[in-house]
């Protein structure tokens, strides 16, 4: 299952669609896409 907004992650692949893994905070954040 994918990680939702502010969920923990190691890479962007861990996050749900339209989310990207922040390298500084290790959490999923919106990547700016719709």
From Swiss-Prot:
Molecular-function GO terms, alphabetical: ion channel inhibitor activity; potassium channel regulator activity; toxin activity
Free-text comment about domains: The presence of a 'disulfide through disulfide knot' structurally defines this protein as a knottin.
Effect seen on changing residue 30 to A: Exhibits <300-fold weaker interaction with Kv2.1 channels
Effect listed in the UniProt record for changing residue 29 to S: Exhibits 7.5-fold weaker interaction with Kv2.1 channels
Protein name (record): Kappa-theraphotoxin-Scg1a
Effect of residue 10 to A: No change in interaction with Kv2.1 channels
InterPro entries: Huwentoxin-1 (IPR011696)
Organism: Stromatopelma calceatum griseipes (Feather leg baboon tarantula)
Note: Shows no or very low activity on Nav1.2/SCN2A, Nav1.4/SCN4A, Nav1.5/SCN5A, Nav1.6/SCN8A, and Nav1.7/SCN9A (IC(50)>3 uM).
Known outcome of mutating residue 24 to A: Exhibits 20-fold tigher interaction with Kv2.1 channels
Tissue-level expression: Expressed by the venom gland.
Family of the protein in this entry: Belongs to the neurotoxin 10 (Hwtx-1) family. 09 (HaTx) subfamily.
Subcellular location: Secreted
Disulphide bond pairs: 2-16, 9-21, 15-28
Function as written in the Swiss-Prot or TrEMBL entry: Reversibly inhibits potassium currents in oocytes expressing Kv2.1/KCNB1 channels (Kd=2.7 uM). Acts by shifting activation of the channel to more depolarized voltages. The toxin may bind to the S3b-S4 helices of the voltage sensor paddle. One, two, three or four toxin molecules may bind the Kv2.1/KCNB1 channel. It shows low to moderate affinity for lipid bilayers. It partitions into the bilayer membrane, where it stabilizes at the water/membrane interface.
Outcome of substituting residue 6 to A: Exhibits <300-fold weaker interaction with Kv2.1 channels
Site (May be involved in interaction with voltage sensor, positioned at 9 angstroms from the center of the bilayer): 30
Presence of the UniProt keyword Disulfide bond in the record: yes
Known outcome of mutating residue 34 to A: No change in interaction with Kv2.1 channels
GO CC aspect terms: extracellular space
